[in-house]
Structures are given as structure tokens and as C-alpha cells.
Amino acid sequence: MAKEKFDRSKEHANIGTIGHVDHGKTTLTAAIATVLAKNGDTVAQSYDMIDNAPEEKERGITINTAHIEYQTDKRHYAHVDCPGHADYVKNMITGAAQMDGGILVVSAADGPMPQTREHILLSRNVGVPALVVFLNKVDMVDDEELLELVEMEVRDLLSEYDFPGDDVPVIAGSALKALEGDAQYEEKILELMQAVDDYIPTPERDSDKPFMMPVEDVFSITGRGTVATGRVERGQIKVGEEVEIIGIHDTSKTTVTGVEMFRKLLDYAEAGDNIGALLRGVAREDVQRGQVLAAPGSITPHTKFKADVYVLSKDEGGRHTPFFTNYRPQFYFRTTDVTGVVNLPEGTEMVMPGDNVEMTVELIAPIAIEDGTRFSIREGGRTVGSGVVTEIIE
């Protein structure tokens, strides 16, 4: 079957659900697709379709990021259902990095929980521009005052991490009831999507900058070659253009021979699109997650840089003890983690949880970075800091 062309007439935005485990992120994702399907251009998606990665079934927690698409009158959305559980924050870091806006799901019955805070912090660190709040499971709360209290708590938490807590739209509803077809709660889903349409700014596309796409996944298509998938971070790529594969190994060049999005073929892709790029003459093992595809000469691989770093406090789930020069955590850039050695500036003996610090980092493998590149610092499966590159050294 020939693939149909992708419709570009509507503006496009990438959004996702974030929040504490079991507060209803996946149910809400299914409810949005199901309710919008009744009103027009969207294909309904069941909860099981979204929650379908094999690992998830055993533990009842969402691990992989599910991508679905739906439309409102105003926009076409690509929606990522971000994993909620702390063990899978690694995926959250790569998932949240793909968001022009987020829907923060908070169970009205439980209020904000540790991962609610962690996801707001991560959203701030990976540069998610705006969040909208969905207070879920309100059918389980009889007390109007309790709802108001939870809403106030969420707003305060957002303000604490520099989101405009007083202005953020908060919609109260029940994803499960909406999914079951309860008209009163379906209306709340439409209200939520109206808020997303209105409040989440039209993504400022970096289409005019040189092309770059962080590689998230790689697979081979028999008879066609190797495909790298990811979200175009900036610029445009047209079929037939040259790109460099940068990071981890020596830089190499290839030509993009095909571009597709949501299984539809494109002539070109631009910043914000989630695509698969078919690469000419590249073996499956020549490209890997953590590398980037970029316009030749536009970005270079480096191992040593200066950075401004915020070290999470113990209460935020960070370290309980200070660290010193020669500390060796993992540095997460875009889609991958690389071990690096920390060098603290003269006069800084140690760094306490909750501190801001300027540090020099030397990575064990080169990564495509430049001033302004953001990263997270992780150790033993948890985020302990976040930072931004301030100066490239080598």
C-alpha cells in the first residue's frame, strides 16, 4: 500500500502527559484520543494500545514512551505518554525533551506526590515551555474544599520551579469516566484540549537554523537500508541532502535518501517533527542512540566543557552527601548518558545537595555539544543535578 502524504495545513505541536505513577497519565492519553475521535479527525486509541510495551504488563507501570497523534480544530498533536515511575526517569528525560508543552496529571484523591515534583523539575530542566494541569479522579473526591486545596498545592509547586503557577490552567475531571463515555466528563476533556490549544504557545520552530536531529533509535529495513529515528531539534532536512553523524565515534557523512513521519512519506522534515531518516550506505552498527544527525559543519563533538549546574537537594530526590572534584556521574545529553569526570573550580572544596555550582566536565566519549546545550546528571538510576553548557574547552 502506498503511503499517504502528511497534511501540513494545521500547526503542529508535540505534547505529553507527565506526573506521578498511577495518577492516570495513560488513561488520560486514551481519553483524549477517544473523545477527540468522536468530534472529527482523530483515530481512537484504546488504553491497551497505548500501554502496550511488553515490560509494562508485568509491573503495571508504563515504561516505554508511546507516541500517538490526534487533532483539535486548531492543531495537529503528536502526544508522548511519558513513563511515570522513578526507575524510568531516564526515559522521562528523553521523552520530556520532546515536548512543546505538557499536561501535568495529578490525582485529586492523592494530591502532588514526589514524582509530581520531579517531573515538574525535569520539565523545567529540559526546557518544556508550558504546562497545563489536569486534576484527575475528581469523581472519587466529594469534598469541594479538598479539590481547591489540591489545586493550590499544585499551583505553588509550579511556581516553585519557575512556571507561572497563578496563570496555569487547571481542569478538573475524570479520565476514566470520560473514557467510559460519561458526557459530563467528556466535556472536561474538550475543556482540557481547549486550554492546551490556547495556553501552550505555538511552538517557536527553529526551522531556520542548521539541521540537527538527536538519534533515539536505529533499525534496518531489508532492502532499503538503515533508519535513524528522532525528533528534529532544529532546521530542515530534505531528501537527498548530506548530513554528518556526530558523537561517540569519529564523525562520518551520509546522504538522507528518505524521510517519513507517522508512516507517511515526506519530501522534507523540519524542527519539531518526529521522523525516521533513511541513511545511504550506513550499516546498522554505524549509528546509535546518543549521536546526532546534523548539517555538515554546524555542530562538533567535544569532551571537555564548562557548565552551570544545579545539584538537587535531598528533598528533591538528590544526593544526601556532598561530592568533590573527580566525582564521576553520568551526564545525559539529549538521548544518552556518558560518564564524565567533574572538576570543581579553585576554592570550591565540595558541592552540597541544593547548591548551584560552576564546574568543568571531561566526558569519556565525545558528544555533539555547544553553548546552551542542556544536560542532566544522574547516578545509580536517579537524577542528582541538571546543567547547561556555558563554554566549550575542547
UniProtKB/Swiss-Prot annotation:
Stretches the record annotates as G2: 60-64
Top enzyme class: hydrolase
SUPFAM superfamilies: EF-Tu/eEF-1alpha/eIF2-gamma C-terminal domain (SSF50465), P-loop containing nucleoside triphosphate hydrolases (SSF52540), Translation proteins (SSF50447)
Compartments where found: Cytoplasm
Annotated segments matching region G5: 174-176
Region (G1): 19-26
Family: Belongs to the TRAFAC class translation factor GTPase superfamily. Classic translation factor GTPase family. EF-Tu/EF-1A subfamily.
Record protein name field: Elongation factor Tu
Species this chain originates from: Staphylococcus haemolyticus (strain JCSC1435)
